[in-house]
C-alpha cells in the first residue's frame, strides 16, 4: 500500500465539501452506541453500560458532519457520570464537531443499594435512567445548556376502592412512575433524589430482597397508604413542583392492574 495514501492530507475530505441544496439539517449524528460508563451515585461509583444518541445541527452549506468525532469524544470520557459531567460532555461536543448546536442523550441501568425496612438486609434495586443535554451557542459565542433527567421507578400501588368495599384485603399491583425533568444546571440533582420523589409517594416502595418481617411491613404499609393512579401522579407531581432545582417536568404513572388485563395511567406536565 502506498504510504502517501495513508496521510490524511492526501485524502479527499468529501464530507467537508460544499452543499448547494440550501437545506440545513436539524439533527445528524449517531445512535444505538453502547459504551461502558462509570456512574457516580450517593453510595459510591459503579459500572454500567450506556446506550447513546449524539447529534449536531448541520448548516445548509456543509455536506456532512464529522461522524467519527462523536465516537472519539466518547472514547475520551473517563470521568464518573453525574449532572456535571453530562453538561461538560455536550459542551465539549460543539467545538469538536464545528457545530453551533448539539444534543447528547443516553440510557443506562442505575443501581441503588437499599436496606430492607425491618431486617435491614441489603440488596440492589435497578432503575432505567436517561440523561439528556442540549447545547446551543448564541451570537455572542457563549454556550447555553439545557439538562434533562428521566427515571423510571417501579413502585407498589394499592387500590383505595378495593380496600373500602372489601371485607378482606385489597387488590394491589406493581406500578411504574416515569419522571422527566429539566434541571437548573447551576444546582445539583442526583438520580437518587429523583427516584426518592416517586418512592416516597407510592403505596410502598420496592426492594430486591425482603425477609418475612419485611414482607409483613410492606403489606401493611401499602394497605394503610392506598392510592389510585390519579393520587400517585398528583402526589409525585406535587413533590417535583416544590423542588427548586427542577424547571419543568412530566410525570407518567402506570398501574399494571392485577384484576384487569389492561393498565391504568395518568400524566401531569408542568413548567415553572
Curated annotation (Swiss-Prot):
InterPro entries: GTP_cyclohydrolase_FolE2 (IPR022838), GTP_cyclohydrolase_FolE2/MptA (IPR003801). The record marks 159 as: May be catalytically important. It comes from the Bacteria. It catalyses: GTP + H2O = 7,8-dihydroneopterin 3'-triphosphate + formate + H(+). Keywords: Hydrolase. It holds the Pfam family GCHY-1. Coiled coil: none annotated. Belongs to the GTP cyclohydrolase IV family. This is GTP cyclohydrolase FolE2. It comes from Polynucleobacter asymbioticus (strain DSM 18221 / CIP 109841 / QLW-P1DMWA-1). The gene is folE2.
